[in-house]
Amino acid sequence: MPFGNEVNIFPLISTLRKKKYSVFVPYIQEFYFKMIPLRMPLQKNVFGIYESNNSTFNLIKVDAVIIPVLGIDKDFRRIGFGKGMYDRFMSCLKKKVYVIFVARSPNYTPSVITESYDVQGDCFVTPSALCLRKHNGSMVCNRRYNLRIIGGRECISYHKKDF
């Protein structure tokens, strides 16, 4: 669920539920979280994040994970609030899942500022940009939009034929 300056994903969650997708949300317990089915009403926890009531549920299969981010770095890794909760959750999954990062604005740093254990995305979506991580690690972005470079003056080039 969104926190602070992260993008509001409630409209996306609503659309997924209307299409009969199973939606799971984090339930925070101290320094980790588990995924539980989304149930209304949502309540604010001690961190000010909306969450469903706790439930016992074994998450068997995950196809994709949508993770709010503040931005991404050169390695297509998440820039967030630094608590490591998504990192710990993703490391517990039995297989690699498709990771979709969503952000309010297309913030990107051409430097590596994350660690190897930080969550690495496959797709980065903002209202003005769509970027995909290719198998060789390079990034391809929607040509109509530009990423906002943070922490540097380097440019990113796009090739429409790749997208």
Residue ranges, per PLM feature:
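Short, well-ordered strand-loop elements centered on a beta-strand within folded domains, enriched
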Residues: 31-37, 77-79, 141-142
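Charged helix-capping and loop-helix junction motifs
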Residues: 14, 81-86
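Surface-exposed, charge/polar-rich loops and edge strands
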Residues: 60-65, 74-77, 88-163
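N-terminal active-site beta-alpha-beta segment that forms phosphate/nucleotide-binding
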Residues: 1-61
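Residue-level signal for inorganic ion chemistry
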Residues: 23, 66, 82, 124
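A structured binding-face within diverse protein domains that lines the active/interaction site
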Residues: 52, 67-70
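Short glycine-rich anion-binding loops that position phosphate/pyrophosphate groups of nucleotides
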Residues: 2-5, 70-74
